[in-house]
Amino acid sequence: MTIVATATRPQRAEGRGHLAAKLLDGRTRIRELYQEGAAKIRLPNTFDASMEAVIINTAGGLTGGDRMDWSVVAGAGTKIDVTTQACEKIYKASAGVAEVTTRIEAGAGARVDWLPQETILFDRAALFRRLDVDLDESAEFLAVEAVLLGRKAMGETVDTGLFRDRWRIRRSGRLIHAEELRFSEGVAALSARQAVLGGQVAFATLLYAGPLAEAYLGRVRSLLEGAMGGASAWGDKLVVRLAAADGFTLRKILIPVISVLRNGAPVPKVWNL
């Protein structure tokens, strides 16, 4: 008897979630909601005119070959806060690259706050993340992306791997902001450079696009005193970059800055759980 071995493709996590909102009777309401695979969207009750969306990866993390796609469309006059249920963990990849793509559209007078909790990269993880945003001329947008190179309290380090983070932010079709971050191969050696992270293992980028950018700048800079970071504003755009020794230290700086850029509103409640 001849036994023929067949190659089995490893099971991969895939998901797609889509949320579109409209303004109805002065409140932000669901217009479309779609969930597929490991992607879930939950909408907690709110007590104002805004909508809070919590996106969930039911696979519990990502590894090479996994793919998640999210899209959010905020209709004219709506306000949506989008966050994650927990930190997204990117595990060691035996083959392939995990991909996460997020597309956001904000209509006239709309505001979208993209506030995922931290992404945790483990040693030999591989992730390519894309954020594509299209804003109306009068829309506001806030994005926060924080990354941890392992969990310092657990003794974890990231010596090698791949992390690509690509942002393209457009207003009325014209490009107003682009990010192209890449860590590959010797992650520990690269992040140790003074011009990169100076040996810190937690870092974040924040972008606010809206009419209050320059008005927020002074308050943001006062919060960054003594921290490894900086803020700049020009026109209707404010950018903040931060680095810290660990995730806890980063959060202590990050949360007050986010609150300023939300005009005093706190971070979503799931951040405190």
Curated annotation (Swiss-Prot):
Family (UniProt): Belongs to the UreD family.
The protein depicted here goes by the name Urease accessory protein UreD
Q: What does this protein do?
A: Required for maturation of urease via the functional incorporation of the urease nickel metallocenter.
| One family name in Pfam for this protein | UreD
Q: Does the keyword Cytoplasm apply?
A: yes
Q: Which keywords does UniProt give here?
A: Chaperone, Cytoplasm, Nickel insertion
Any one GO CC term of this protein is: cytoplasm
Q: Where in the cell is it found?
A: Cytoplasm
Kindly list the organism's lineage: Bacteria, Pseudomonadati, Pseudomonadota, Alphaproteobacteria, Hyphomicrobiales
Organism of this sequence: Rhizobium etli (strain ATCC 51251 / DSM 11541 / JCM 21823 / NBRC 15573 / CFN 42)
The molecular function GO annotations come to: nickel cation binding
Note the subunit structure: UreD, UreF and UreG form a complex that acts as a GTP-hydrolysis-dependent molecular chaperone, activating the urease apoprotein by helping to assemble the nickel containing metallocenter of UreC. The UreE protein probably delivers the nickel.
